[in-house]
């Protein structure tokens, strides 16, 4: 299997998405099975417990959409928390902003970071050696629960789909704790699953954030290797959430360093909520 190209599939609710390639690494960590695959089209890719997580070719569709709507619109962004994010892509995008002075990246599975540093160097880029990034191998829920009030300007939840060790990252109690440790005008940004392949979880996340925060907005775009291809990211705040109010000079500089995100892309993506989701949120 490690020498010959083969089709490697993710199975989800009677469907599957396969990539042709060679397995470069297969190992079990304390939490999950980890595969690194050299795919024919998407380059090196990370698979966790049989689910595609990211690839060198398509990762920016995910990471740029998670990070830039929040960081381009908030004035104070010096202290950032990333829950998960072991591939380094979210940290890389955050570090494009000179105002960011400290990032705490809390990843429960150290092996994900190790294999990403070795095999997915294009994704983490220079983030791993940036002095502003502090890596903590810890449980994200416990980290948030033990953090002082008003500690972070932005929190990014960059986690995998709900599982035995990540379910608590999708609960009301966790979102309330995140709210507590945000600064007054802070923003919570989270991947909020697919409105197609994970509709029930998606609805749960949006309803929870609508209930816990005064303001929330959801954007939709595509991540090619994820189930159904369509994905979402939700942003929430209690004081201010004007995601189109940006520093245009700064945005132009960021846009020039992005492959997917720009302000026009973002503005359109926030208007793409499927009507079935609208109706279920209002029911």
From Swiss-Prot:
<dbReference type="GO" id="GO:0004766">
    <property type="term" value="F:spermidine synthase activity"/>
</dbReference>
<feature type="domain" description="PABS">
    <location>
        <begin position="5"/>
        <end position="238"/>
    </location>
</feature>
<dbReference type="Pfam" id="PF17284">
    <property type="entry name" value="Spermine_synt_N"/>
</dbReference>
<comment type="similarity">
    <text>Belongs to the spermidine/spermine synthase family.</text>
</comment>
<dbReference type="InterPro" id="IPR035246">
    <property type="entry name" value="Spermidine_synt_N"/>
</dbReference>
<dbReference type="InterPro" id="IPR001045">
    <property type="entry name" value="Spermi_synthase"/>
</dbReference>
<feature type="binding site">
    <location>
        <position position="107"/>
    </location>
    <ligand>
        <name>S-methyl-5'-thioadenosine</name>
    </ligand>
</feature>
<feature type="binding site">
    <location>
        <begin position="139"/>
        <end position="140"/>
    </location>
    <ligand>
        <name>S-methyl-5'-thioadenosine</name>
    </ligand>
</feature>
<comment type="subunit">
    <text>Homodimer or homotetramer.</text>
</comment>
<comment type="function">
    <text>Catalyzes the irreversible transfer of a propylamine group from the amino donor S-adenosylmethioninamine (decarboxy-AdoMet) to putrescine (1,4-diaminobutane) to yield spermidine.</text>
</comment>
<dbReference type="GO" id="GO:0008295">
    <property type="term" value="P:spermidine biosynthetic process"/>
</dbReference>
<dbReference type="Pfam" id="PF01564">
    <property type="entry name" value="Spermine_synth"/>
</dbReference>
<feature type="active site" description="Proton acceptor">
    <location>
        <position position="158"/>
    </location>
</feature>
<feature type="binding site">
    <location>
        <begin position="158"/>
        <end position="161"/>
    </location>
    <ligand>
        <name>spermidine</name>
    </ligand>
</feature>
<keyword id="KW-0963">Cytoplasm</keyword>
<protein>
    <recommendedName>
        <fullName>Polyamine aminopropyltransferase</fullName>
        <ecNumber>2.5.1.16</ecNumber>
    </recommendedName>
</protein>
<dbReference type="GO" id="GO:0005737">
    <property type="term" value="C:cytoplasm"/>
</dbReference>
<dbReference type="InterPro" id="IPR029063">
    <property type="entry name" value="SAM-dependent_MTases_sf"/>
</dbReference>
<dbReference type="InterPro" id="IPR037163">
    <property type="entry name" value="Spermidine_synt_N_sf"/>
</dbReference>
<comment type="pathway">
    <text>Amine and polyamine biosynthesis; spermidine biosynthesis; spermidine from putrescine: step 1/1.</text>
</comment>
<feature type="binding site">
    <location>
        <position position="63"/>
    </location>
    <ligand>
        <name>spermidine</name>
    </ligand>
</feature>
<feature type="binding site">
    <location>
        <position position="32"/>
    </location>
    <ligand>
        <name>S-methyl-5'-thioadenosine</name>
    </ligand>
</feature>
<dbReference type="InterPro" id="IPR030373">
    <property type="entry name" value="PABS_CS"/>
</dbReference>
<keyword id="KW-0620">Polyamine biosynthesis</keyword>
<keyword id="KW-0808">Transferase</keyword>
<feature type="binding site">
    <location>
        <position position="87"/>
    </location>
    <ligand>
        <name>spermidine</name>
    </ligand>
</feature>
<keyword id="KW-0745">Spermidine biosynthesis</keyword>
<dbReference type="InterPro" id="IPR030374">
    <property type="entry name" value="PABS"/>
</dbReference>
């Amino acid at each position: 299997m490690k020498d010959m190209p083969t089709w490697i599939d993710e199975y989800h609710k009677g469907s599957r998405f396969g990539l042709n390639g060679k397995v470069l690494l297969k190992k079990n960590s304390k939490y999950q099975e980890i595969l690194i695959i050299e795919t024919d089209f998407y380059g090196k890719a990370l698979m966790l417990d049989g689910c595609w997580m990211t690839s060198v070719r398509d990762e920016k569709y995910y990471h740029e959409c998670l990070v830039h709507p929040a960081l381009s619109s908030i004035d104070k962004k010096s202290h950032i928390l990333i829950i998960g994010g072991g591939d380094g892509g979210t940290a890389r995008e955050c570090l494009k902003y000179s105002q960011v002075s400290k990032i705490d990246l809390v990843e429960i599975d150290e092996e994900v970071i190790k294999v990403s540093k070795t095999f997915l160097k294009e994704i983490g880029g220079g983030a791993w050696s940036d002095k502003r990034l502090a890596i903590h191998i810890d449980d994200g829920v416990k980290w948030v629960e033990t953090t002082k009030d008003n500690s972070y300007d932005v929190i990014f939840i960059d986690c995998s789909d709900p599982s035995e060790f990540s379910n608590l990252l999708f609960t009301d109690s966790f979102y309330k704790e995140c709210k507590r440790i945000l600064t007054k005008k802070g923003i919570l940004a989270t991947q909020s699953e697919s409105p197609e392949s994970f509709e029930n979880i998606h609805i749960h996340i949006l309803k929870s954030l609508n209930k816990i925060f005064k303001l929330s907005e959801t954007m939709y775009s595509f991540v090619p290797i994820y189930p159904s291809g369509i994905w979402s990211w939700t942003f929430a705040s209690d004081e201010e959430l004007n995601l189109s109010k940006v520093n245009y000079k700064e945005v132009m500089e960021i846009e020039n360093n992005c492959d997917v995100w720009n302000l026009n892309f973002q503005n359109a993506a926030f208007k793409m909520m499927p009507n079935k989701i609208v109706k279920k949120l209002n029911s």
